[in-house]
Amino acid sequence: NNIDVNGDSITVLNYGYIRKQYMAILIQNDAGEWQYFSVNGDNVYVSGEFSGGRKFNDIAVGEFDSPQEFLNSPYNSYGASDDMSINTYGFSEGYMIPTSKEQDDIIRDTFISISKNESYDFLGNNCSTVVQKSLEAAGIITFTQKSTRHRIPSSHYLGESSFIATISTSRPVIPSVSFRAIIKNNPQGKMIYR
């Protein structure tokens, strides 16, 4: 897995596998520096506490020489969601995928457009799906779409004849599931750790 970290590539960031999970992305800018992009939710009050991330999105935050520099930076720290000096997650891993400059531009523009124009929705437009949609816009496969057909038998008692139902898989919404699907569909990438 020889990926030129000074060339064109993106890094998908993953936080957590069990209860608290999150996904964000590092995208290179025109100067070749890595910037942090994150759709943070809406920080709603649920069960006696605020959850869902910050009340704002992080768009093109910082300039880091490499994904490793980002992971090891003070900015990549766990803490209060209103602390602008940190990302509040403290990611410990990422997956670098080689891209072209054109793909970087598409990923960046798509991420910014979604974050500005679409409301946060836990099941349809969350931290994980925004990263996936941005990658997909640049031609990067993020999950395997499958369709299965099921024959539903007739029920003469109910007056129904048999029929075929087609069920398609959809984009994963859980960050750790999305992260594993991105890795599976992009084996040319490379894991990095803090």
State where each predicted segment sits.
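Glycine-rich catalytic cores of cysteine/serine-nucleophile enzymes that process amide/ester linkages
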Residues: 1-91, 121
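Short coil/turn linker and secondary-structure boundary residues
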Residues: 62, 99-102, 125
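Proline-rich intrinsically disordered, low-complexity coils
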Residues: 67, 74, 79, 98, ...
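A structural motif
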Residues: 81-110
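Activation targets extended, charge/polar-rich intrinsically disordered C-terminal tails
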Residues: 104-194
